[in-house]
């Protein structure tokens, strides 16, 4: 997770997006694969977490809530992390909307990706068998006058404290344990993520 007023050009570039064709009463209709899966209440969080991607995910969650506030939403995560404020906008929306958000880690959920993974509805947070999770403290960098650097240093410590509190709440670990474990990068396998409380179980196949 990075704490930064700067925004890198992190938007994912998808050169080839498969199209699917459906037969309807009005003939054939084509969808890109992500739009088709959105109809099944599936959202993908892949790549760096940044503002544009976060806005799209928030919009999709709000749309699905409006469509049916009683049905779960499925958030598939494969992310190395990203900007804290972008991730927090996704997190707050997950907590705000009425449908449960089930989170599934495929590949990796690192940094902000791990934070969003564990923020899913209790009992509905999953890892695929060979995925990995990485937790650590927020990263920050700021250039400017000494007084401004001091202001930003205080702010990143405040953000760190709040993120640790939320992580403790969702995992069931003590705040002190979270503080120790996020002092440096900590990688966890899928079974270790279950034991730690980041997820609830491992998905090996569909029922």
Curated annotation (Swiss-Prot):
Entry's Gene Ontology cellular component terms: cytoplasm; endopeptidase Clp complex
EC number(s) given by UniProt: 3.4.21.92
Reaction it catalyzes: Hydrolysis of proteins to small peptides in the presence of ATP and magnesium. alpha-casein is the usual test substrate. In the absence of ATP, only oligopeptides shorter than five residues are hydrolyzed (such as succinyl-Leu-Tyr-|-NHMec, and Leu-Tyr-Leu-|-Tyr-Trp, in which cleavage of the -Tyr-|-Leu- and -Tyr-|-Trp bonds also occurs)
Enzyme class: hydrolase
SUPFAM superfamilies: ClpP/crotonase (SSF52096)
GO biological process per UniProt: protein quality control for misfolded or incompletely synthesized proteins
Keyword Cytoplasm (UniProt): yes
PROSITE patterns reported for this sequence: CLP_PROTEASE_HIS (PS00382), CLP_PROTEASE_SER (PS00381)
Principal cellular location given in the protein's record: cytoplasm
Gene Ontology terms, MF aspect: ATP-dependent peptidase activity; ATPase binding; serine-type endopeptidase activity
Database matches in InterPro entries: ClpP, ClpP/crotonase-like_dom_sf, ClpP/TepA, ClpP_His_AS, ClpP_Ser_AS
Coiled coil segments of this chain: none
Residue ranges listed under propeptide: 1-14
Highest taxon listed in the record's lineage: Bacteria
Presence of keyword Cytoplasm: yes
Subcellular localization, as worded in the UniProt entry: Cytoplasm
Active-site residue numbers: 111 (nucleophile), 136
Protein keywords: Cytoplasm, Hydrolase, Protease, Serine protease, Zymogen
UniProt subunit comment: Fourteen ClpP subunits assemble into 2 heptameric rings which stack back to back to give a disk-like structure with a central cavity, resembling the structure of eukaryotic proteasomes. Component of the ClpAP and ClpXP complexes.
Family from the record: Belongs to the peptidase S14 family.
Main function: Cleaves peptides in various proteins in a process that requires ATP hydrolysis. Has a chymotrypsin-like activity. Plays a major role in the degradation of misfolded proteins.
Full protein name: ATP-dependent Clp protease proteolytic subunit
The organism of origin for this protein: Salmonella paratyphi A (strain ATCC 9150 / SARB42)
